[in-house]
Amino acid sequence: MHSTQLAVNAPFVQPRQIYCLHFDIVHGCQLRCVGCPNSTLLPKIKRISVEDFRVCLGNIDVEKIHTMRLFNFGEPLLHKHLSEIISVIPEQRWKASIVEISTNAQRVDWADFENALKQEVVTRLVVSCDGNGTAEEYERLRPPSKWEHLIEFLDRARVLRDRWSPGLQLITKTVVENAADMQRWRDILVPRGWTPEFRGWMALPESAQNMTNRRLEVPTGSCVFLADPKEYDHHPWGGEIRLLYVDADGTVVPCCIHPRAGVFGNLKTQKYSAILNGAQRAAFKLQMESDRSGMSICGQCDMGPAGNEGPSFHSSMFVDT
C-alpha cells in the first residue's frame, strides 16, 4: 500500500502528551566539534523570530510536555532575543515540567541571559564540555572553543542562578574515556556548584570522525525515534512517550541524531497532530522499514527500535564508576 494511503486510512491519533521536545531556537552552531555533524555540514547561523516561535508552540496541540529542550543541533545562546523567546513558553495551553537549555558556554549576551533566568521558566541549564578535563583536550575536541570561556561561564552562571533562579539545576554533560577523566572533571566542576554527568561517544552520521572506535552496524527497520507510545511498556513516566524535534525554521525533523535526516512538516503552518498523522512521516517510516540501507542518513545510523536501541543510544545515558 502506498504511504499516502497508509496515512489517510490509518485512524487519526490525537496526541495528549509529548515526552521530549527538542526545539532549535538557533539553527547552527559556531563550533565544529569532531563528533558532530556540524563539523562537516558547516551550517550558517539562523535564528527563529519570537513571533514564529510563538506560532510554532501554539501549533503543538497537546496538554503536557515532560521535557522541553531549546536546542537540537544549534547553540541557543546565540539567539539575540533569548529572554523574549523564554517568555513565550508560559503562554502555552500545555505545561512543560522541565525546560532545558544546553550550551557550549562559549558566547553569551550576559544581560539577556540574566533576564532569561529572572523569569524562572528554565529549570535545567546544561553545559557540554567534552574531553579529559584538561584545557588542551577540551579545545582539541571542540574547536574553536576556549577553555577560559568555559570556566568564566561556569562561574558567572552559578552566581546568576543563585541570585535569580535558585531552583535551576546546573548540570554538565561530558564525553569521557575513563574514570580518571571523570575525576578530573569532578575536581573542576563540583566546587563550582555544577553536577557532572558522563557518557560515551555516539556515532552521529556525517560527523568529521566516528569517535566510537567500533564498526558501524546499521539495523534494519525503523528506529526508536519513530516508535509508538505502546512500545514503551516499561517506561517510568506515566504519559505518552512521543518525541518531537523542530528546526529553527519550524521544520519537524525525525530525531536528535542528525539535524535533518528527513522532513515531516512545519509547525509554522501545521498542527503537531497533523504532522504526526501526516503522509510525510508515514512515508519516511515506511522507507525505513523497507529500505533503510538505501537512505542517505538513516543508512549510516546505528539507532535501533525501542527496546533494542543499540550502542550509540546507550552510550548517551548517564554513566559513572
Go through the PLM ranges and name each one.
Residues 1-125, 136-148, 152, 161, ...:
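Conserved alpha-helical substructure of the radical SAM core
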Residues 30-38, 254-257, 295-306:
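Local cysteine-cluster metal-coordination motifs and their immediate loop/turn environment
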Residues 96-100, 168-171, 296:
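Glycine-rich, flexible loop segments associated with nucleotide phosphate handling
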